[in-house]
A protein has these predicted regions:
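Domain-level signature for soluble enzymes in the chorismate/prephenate branch of the shikimate pathway
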Residues: 1-233
Length: 233
């Protein structure tokens, strides 16, 4: 009920791969100016071996995407058959769908949710190499949040592609002693000589110092849009 106006939960960062570029690009390019980040959460990753069979020792095949294989290399090498038949898939969901085309000796890499959605058995858990692997998600929707005193704000700025443009922006944050927690930039394909800069930083857009910061930033870029202020996880 807290986020009844939420429309999606999107993965934004993983310990293994870092920032998920597709999510950031979609936030930058969205045409709906009312879409805001309402919250963030961090969920530990629990990769599992899933199959239609109930016996791990009978597994002779694995369907997975390159990312999943990369995260679980040690387990695959140490615990699965040496002559393992690997079938490449585009995504975790794609792996689960492809599994229907194979016999009971095939398995996939997935999560508890994948097992629930596709009615699969969990044969092994926590097979990822990095046991501290986490995934950060954001909740987006049409709305705003109140300041809690422990907040983060996300913005996108459009700058001329000139030497020193990004440094000018960083200096504004130094001026107000505001900590930048993430910065990511990309060239705009449909706008010559312009770059979009996505930033996360400490504070809420309703805080007096952040309002002063945003006003100052506006004088140093072509345009700026606040994508959300939300409680830090």
């Amino acid at each position: 009920d807290e986020f009844s106006n939420a429309i999606a939960i999107l993965p934004v960062e993983t310990s293994y791969k870092g920032i998920i570029r597709e999510t950031i690009d979609n936030l930058i390019m969205t045409k709906n100016q009312n879409i805001q980040i309402l919250a963030e959460t961090v969920i530990p990753v629990n990769d599992c071996i899933l199959s239609k069979t109930t016996e791990f020792y009978s597994v002779m095949g694995l369907i997975a995407n390159p990312n999943a294989l990369g995260k679980c290399k040690k387990f695959i090498k140490d615990e699965m058959p040496r002559e393992l038949n690997i079938v490449m898939a585009d995504s975790m969901d794609d792996s689960a769908r492809l599994l229907n085309n194979y016999n009971l000796t095939y398995s996939i890499i997935g999560t508890h949710k994948t097992a629930e959605l596709y009615n699969l058995n969990i044969l092994k858990e926590h097979i990822e190499d990095d046991k501290d692997n986490n995934r950060r998600f954001i909740v987006i929707g049409d709305g705003t949040t109140q300041s809690t005193g422990n907040d983060k704000t996300s913005i996108v700025m459009f700058l001329d592609d000139r030497q020193g443009a990004l440094m000018d922006i960083v200096q504004v944050f130094v001026k107000y002693n505001i900590n930048i927690t993430h910065i990511n930039s990309k060239m705009m394909n449909n706008r010559a000589e312009e770059q979009a800069v996505f930033l996360d930083f400490d504070g809420h857009k309703d805080d007096e110092v952040i309002q002063s910061l945003l006003a100052d930033l506006e004088n140093n870029c072509k345009s700026i849009r606040v994508i959300g202020s939300y409680s830090r996880f």
